[in-house]
């Protein structure tokens, strides 16, 4: 009897606790609930409408819309949903703070993005992200002029749209802008869009097949991070140029770009640079004068970034550096971290290359196969091995698809590893990937031979990592 009473008391407490929690939620004002729903993807926010009658239309009052067209049965259903949502917002005189759309449309699908953006482009809009799936340039939708005067806009990402001519830009709060594979009225308007954002800090520009931006000028007094990427196959290469003038720029990423000329001015704030993928500068020419111009251009470019402390470069950028700056290459005295890809035939130039980084502490090498392996001779010892290098990691790449492979014991890799441990005076760690994780491979003769390398540094450890 007593036990039953205790159970009943516990049950009553549980029910009361549940009711208290339910009452707590129900006591929240609609404005707070809609703010909570704002942080959900719209598809998930809509599902809350089944909770109760009160929740049935609360999601319609959220100040944000995040939708993916592929989540709907077809494109027309997607358009109808967005139109109804914006229609409700218009009737209730609501202003959206955020609009994020990921759209996949065909050539015959109706245009709608222009009018949607025009509706949400109010002084209260803070976040706009529009991505339209790969489509022909004839299907690109035009950005309305109203967007260029959103005074509260903080974040802007535009993908596969058309930016027409405009008379003025007023985006006083915009800090992050990403322009990806769009069409621009002309190069001057693109330059103006970038330079007239007074607090812009983060800019990403991805070139596309239709943008026809032969000269990209990035001028800003506030920019701290810049990303430029994309394969610009349709450029007039002889006249293509990227000019960067950003006094506060700290991070620069150039990836798979083919601009003939690259100029960086006022680069004193740069700390990290990535030169990735296909890195191109001026076609080779038999004309000695043209070849001299290219050497000067490449030398000036690397000199302009020589103050960085962290750099990552592709095999193409490495080749450009070796062929066009030696023997008077710029010194990267502040550089402590370097990651570089190298084709195996170019490995013999590695010591000379490393001489440009006298205070290097960390080195990551990605090896790329190109021709059959040959005898590797490394005799010269650069200054950084004798004074500063503490960490080395060697990564391998397959010959066919350039993907990383697991290896130990290959002649070139063995000699390269031996070169570092025998010549680095303060090396703390050498990291090598295993060719196999089987016990037979791990405890093979080659494995133990690596561990028995004579080491110039008494504190050097050799580490194997499976699966790199």
Curated annotation (Swiss-Prot):
Domain of life: Eukaryota
Gene3D superfamilies recorded: 1.20.1280.50, Ribonuclease Inhibitor
Signal peptide stretch: none
Disulfide bonds: none
Matching Pfam families: F-box, FBD, LRR_At5g56370
Domain F-box: start-end pairs: 22-68
Annotated FBD domain residues: 375-433
Protein name in the entry: Putative FBD-associated F-box protein At5g22720
Species of provenance: Arabidopsis thaliana
